[in-house]
Amino acid sequence: MVIKNHSSFFLMVLTIPFIFLLMGCPGQGDRLQLDETTQVKLIGDNICFHITNARNYQPAIISINLRGTSPKKQEFIDNPSLRIRSEQLCIPPSFYQFTDNEKYIVEFVLTSLGSAAEPRKFVVGVGLDHGQVYGFPLTDREILRPYGSIEVPE
């Protein structure tokens, strides 16, 4: 009996440290970054997104696709010729021509120039109806957010 108690204690003492070795400790890159969303509006002919706390962030990549486009067919533009000015990221018609009566999913990643700040990823639902721009709620398949934070009918 004494041997049995010592062997189970010995096994437990060895198991706990090895679990940490196998799993590793969570580091900065292990944290899940949730997507942000923002308001969309028409300024002149440009479709603009309000970026709070823009500081020195600028777009590193952008994707504009019709809602429902499969991930394999989505198109991305690296280092787009767009800039954030006055906390607005604006897309002129010369960059992308939005079609009336369509819904788009616009995704973009902002990186901080000259700073080690974390990149920020935005996902925005953009609709166009008879020349009027509006934002629409996204489903959990379209945006990464805390589980159950917003109920959206699909």
Which stretches of residues belong to each language-model region?
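Hydrophobic helical h-region of N-terminal Sec-dependent signal peptides
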Residues: 14-19
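Contiguous beta-strand segments within globular domains
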Residues: 34-59
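Bacterial N-terminal signal peptides that target proteins for export
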Residues: 2-13
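Acidic, low-complexity Ser/Thr/Gly/Pro-rich repeat segments typical of extracellular/periplasmic
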Residues: 50-52, 56-154
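Short, intrinsically disordered, charge-biased short linear motifs at domain edges
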Residues: 10-12, 36, 75-79
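Bacterial signal peptide processing site
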Residues: 26-28
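C-terminal motif of bacterial Sec signal peptides marking the signal peptidase cleavage site
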Residues: 21-24
